[in-house]
C-alpha cells in the first residue's frame, strides 16, 4: 500500500487567492484521492490494471462536467475550482485527470455548447453520473 506523501508548503501564499468554494472543492477531491486512489494505485499500475471503481468515485465527487449547469448534471463551479479538481486527480494518477477532463471537456462541453436541448437532456446527465 503506497503512502500518500503530499505535503507541499505554500511558499507564495497562493491559497489566500482561492475562494472558500475553490478550497472546498480542492479538499474534497484531495481527500477522495488520498483515501481511494493513493493506497492502491501503485499496485494497480504495476499489474497493468485500472480500478473501474475510480470512475464511479470521480462521478460521486462531481468530476464529470462540474462546470455545467445543475440541470445537466454539473455543479456550475468556476474554472479555478475545476483546475484545482484536475490538479488533485492528477496527483493521484494521470489517467484519472485524463478520464475526467476528456469526458468533461471534449465530450460534455461540446454537447452543451453545440447540442440541441434534447441531446443535452439525453446525454449530459447520464454522462455526469456514469450511466452510459
PLM features per residue range, with description:
Residues 37-132:
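Glycine-rich flavin
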Amino acid at each position: 500500500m503506497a503512502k500518500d506523501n503530499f505535503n507541499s508548503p505554500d511558499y507564495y501564499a497562493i491559497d489566500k487567492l482561492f475562494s472558500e468554494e475553490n478550497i472546498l472543492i480542492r479538499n474534497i477531491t484531495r481527500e477522495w484521492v488520498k483515501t481511494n486512489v493513493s493506497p492502491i494505485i501503485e499496485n494497480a499500475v504495476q499489474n497493468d490494471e485500472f480500478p473501474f471503481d475510480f470512475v464511479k468515485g470521480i462521478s460521486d465527487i462531481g468530476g464529470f462536467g462540474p462546470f455545467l449547469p445543475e440541470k445537466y448534471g454539473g455543479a456550475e463551479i468556476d474554472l479555478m475550482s475545476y483546475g484545482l479538481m484536475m490538479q488533485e486527480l492528477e496527483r493521484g494518477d494521470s489517467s484519472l485527470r485524463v478520464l475526467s477532463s476528456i469526458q468533461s471537456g471534449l465530450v460534455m462541453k461540446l454537447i452543451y455548447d453545440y447540442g440541441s436541448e434534447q441531446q443535452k437532456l439525453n446525454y449530459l446527465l447520464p454522462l455526469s453520473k456514469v450511466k452510459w
